């Protein structure tokens, strides 16, 4: 029974999913209730995670499931991201007539899958979590089934994700075949010498994981899926699954295969460099803001992978800090995007921001701070996120990676500054509606303040993350 206390968050969210589904089926017009209860369920799940003792490494189910500082922190990030997504998307879903009970249930299901992934210490447990997350995301991508683009994006994501899952499963089978176990700790104890079969297994698993975070060259799904999916779903895609996938990267590489760093480090460096360069260059020609943020997120994942490729605790911690700040920046950006509404129609191109500062000065100021932060301009939070990554990379004498990262940051700054130029210097268009959901306004205010004021108290986040020691 003591063990069950450590998985109470997962048990509670599982029961919540079943209860909300039954409530939605048996009670007519219950979308509002189910939606609000889903947000409440996530907040209670977060409280249950906080109740778990800190600085303890608890292993459950024959070491297949772990509860430690890394899992607790990343689960909190995932749950906060999910709660904000549900809170700010209600008006959008109602306008498109997709305010259904299935939406919060699918969000909760994918978050449950992510929580299992984050705590997994076994290839089988990890794969079960991954598939639970993916099955919910396939449906979410095509949730607005009356729109051709949404159905198309769901189908594209399903086909390509199924391919990546197949490669990942093949990699798992190779690792199991050559090590004789699926448990990360057992595999780590056996890994005194490298074997070509194991190296191939690692490569296949890394390919599958790279697809999940849309790292180059496995990014091809991201722009189309981001653009075609409903904006509320795109927001979820952009932030939450990547937190879980990055945690799996950390566990998979630094627990069973830390002794094989010579084999996987070059792969991670390649993924990082390719993602940073491609993400910076490909976004330049984009006019649709959702496609632009897709390419931007590819670049951001490159920076996160740069931290992981260092092979040091500092590198891992810098990547975790980067993902935390990335989540806040994207939440703020999409909050602004959901405010671009006029007569029940949403606008999502750069041209639609033309002269926004004349009619909506406060919204424009928020966008200014968010875009400067995404570009990595001091003293905003995005600058510190990149600073920690570059510091960790340079400490390991990986100068080429740091130079590529800096050059990519300069190139990426161009398209962020181009949007600011459109907002402040182009001719204004008809003003947008101002009667927004209080949660949407609160989300934008909260996330923008975090971006602006992070430099005053950066030590708090660093102090929490410094407790996460993997190596």
Curated annotation (Swiss-Prot):
The chain crosses the membrane at residues 6-26, 30-50, 70-90, 98-118, 123-143, 158-178, 198-218, 230-250, 264-284, 292-312, 320-340, 365-385, 400-420, 438-458. InterPro entries: NADH-Q_OxRdtase_suN/2, ND/Mrp_TM. GO terms for biological process: ATP synthesis coupled electron transport. GO terms for cellular component: plasma membrane. It holds the Pfam family Proton_antipo_M. The keyword Ribonucleoprotein does not apply. It is a multi-pass membrane protein. Its EC number is 7.1.1.-. The keyword Ribonucleoprotein does not apply. GO terms for molecular function: NADH dehydrogenase (ubiquinone) activity; NADH:ubiquinone reductase (non-electrogenic) activity; quinone binding. Keywords: Cell inner membrane, Cell membrane, Membrane, NAD, Quinone, Translocase, Transmembrane, Transmembrane helix, Transport, Ubiquinone. It is found in: Cell inner membrane. It catalyses: a quinone + NADH + 5 H(+)(in) = a quinol + NAD(+) + 4 H(+)(out). NDH-1 is composed of 14 different subunits. Subunits NuoA, H, J, K, L, M, N constitute the membrane sector of the complex. Belongs to the complex I subunit 2 family. PANTHER family: NADH DEHYDROGENASE (PTHR22773). NDH-1 shuttles electrons from NADH, via FMN and iron-sulfur (Fe-S) centers, to quinones in the respiratory chain. The immediate electron acceptor for the enzyme in this species is believed to be ubiquinone. Couples the redox reaction to proton translocation (for every two electrons transferred, four hydrogen ions are translocated across the cytoplasmic membrane), and thus conserves the redox energy in a proton gradient. This is NADH-quinone oxidoreductase subunit N. The gene is nuoN.
């Amino acid at each position: 029974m003591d063990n069950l206390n450590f998985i109470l968050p997962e048990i509670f969210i599982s029961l919540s999913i079943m209860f909300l589904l039954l409530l939605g089926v048996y009670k007519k017009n219950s979308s509002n209730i189910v939606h609000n209860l889903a947000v409440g369920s996530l907040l209670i799940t977060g409280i249950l995670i906080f109740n778990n003792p800190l600085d303890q490494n608890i292993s459950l189910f024959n070491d297949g499931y772990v509860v430690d500082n890394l899992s607790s922190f990343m689960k909190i990030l995932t749950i906060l991201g999910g709660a904000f997504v549900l809170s700010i998307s209600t008006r959008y879903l109602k306008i498109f007539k997709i305010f259904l009970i299935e939406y919060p249930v699918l969000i909760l299901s994918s978050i449950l899958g992510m929580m299992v992934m984050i705590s997994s210490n076994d290839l089988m447990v990890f794969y079960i979590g991954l598939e639970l997350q993916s099955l919910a995301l396939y449906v979410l991508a095509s949730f607005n089934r009356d729109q051709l683009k949404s159905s198309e994006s769901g189908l594209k994501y399903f086909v390509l994700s199924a391919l990546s899952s197949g490669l990942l499963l093949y990699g798992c089978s190779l690792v199991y075949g050559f090590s004789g176990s699926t448990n990360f700790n057992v595999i780590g104890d056996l890994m005194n010498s490298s074997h070509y079969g194991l190296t191939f297994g690692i490569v296949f698993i890394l390919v599958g994981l790279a697809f999940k975070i849309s790292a180059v060259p496995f990014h091809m799904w991201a722009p189309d899926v981001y653009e075609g999916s409903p904006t509320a779903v795109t927001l979820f895609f952009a932030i939450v699954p990547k937190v879980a996938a990055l945690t799996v990267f950390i566990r998979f590489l630094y627990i069973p295969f830390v002794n094989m760093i010579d084999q996987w480090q070059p792969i991670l460096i390649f993924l990082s460099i390719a993602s940073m360069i491609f993400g910076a260059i490909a976004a330049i020609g984009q006019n649709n803001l959702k496609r632009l943020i897709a390419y931007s997120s590819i670049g951001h994942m490159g920076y996160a992978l740069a931290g992981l490729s260092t092979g040091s605790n500092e590198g891992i911690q810098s990547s975790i800090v980067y993902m935390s700040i990335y989540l806040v920046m994207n939440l703020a950006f999409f909050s602004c995007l959901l405010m671009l509404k006029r007569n029940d129609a949403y606008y999502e191109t750069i041209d639609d921001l033309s002269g926004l500062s004349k009619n909506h000065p406060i919204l424009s100021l928020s966008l200014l701070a968010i875009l400067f932060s995404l570009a990595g301009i001091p003293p905003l939070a995005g600058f510190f996120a990149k600073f920690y990554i570059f510091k960790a990379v340079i400490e390991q004498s990986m100068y080429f990676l740091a130079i590529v990262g800096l050059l990519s940051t300069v190139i990426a700054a161009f398209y962020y500054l181009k949007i600011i130029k459109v907002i402040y210097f182009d001719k204004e268009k008809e003003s947008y509606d101002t009667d927004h959901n209080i949660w949407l306004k609160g989300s934008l205010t909260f996330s923008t303040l975090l971006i602006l004021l992070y430099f005053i108290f950066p030590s708090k986040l660093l102090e929490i993350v410094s407790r996460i020691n993997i190596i």
